[in-house]
Regions:
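Short, surface-exposed, charged amphipathic helix/loop patches that serve as local interaction elements
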Residues: 40-129
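Short, charged/polar N-terminal "headpieces" of proteins
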Residues: 1-66, 128-129
Length: 129
């Protein structure tokens, strides 16, 4: 093996793998807070969400047992929502009740936030409020 080739192999082995570099650049424990308020603007509950991974999305699709985006989204909500102490806010079986008994606009607001389309407050900011 030529010396330049050996040097290239040594440099590569000391460098971090691309996948590790990319994955290590994001903190999957960094939670965002959603304040659920009632029609009078009073706080009902604070929900917290970690970033969604592709594996999370696939698990929600599998548990929904359908390609219906609304059902998948509510399953994702039940799977990802946490209380402040990190415990799960919902059981997977709660998806049906949320779809049946929660006003559509409220469920939409929570799910849009979950998917990063609503207003965001990071946990650091939330604790400073």
């Amino acid at each position: 093996m030529s010396q330049p080739h050996q040097l290239a192999l040594m440099a590569t082995s000391k460098q971090q793998r691309t996948v590790d570099l990319i994955c290590g650049s994001f903190d999957l424990n960094d939670r965002r807070k959603f304040d659920l308020k009632n029609a009078d603007g009073e706080l009902v509950i604070e929900l917290f969400f970690k970033p969604i991974t592709r594996a999370d999305r696939l698990r929600a699709m599998e548990s929904a047992g359908t390609e219906d985006a609304l059902k998948i989204s509510t399953n994702m909500l039940c799977q990802m929502a946490e209380l402040e102490d990190g415990t799960k806010a919902f059981a997977m079986a709660d998806a049906v009740k949320l779809q049946r008994e929660l006003p559509e606009n409220v469920l939409n607001d929570i799910e849009l936030f979950l998917h990063g389309l609503g207003s965001e407050v990071g946990l650091g900011e939330a604790k400073n409020d």
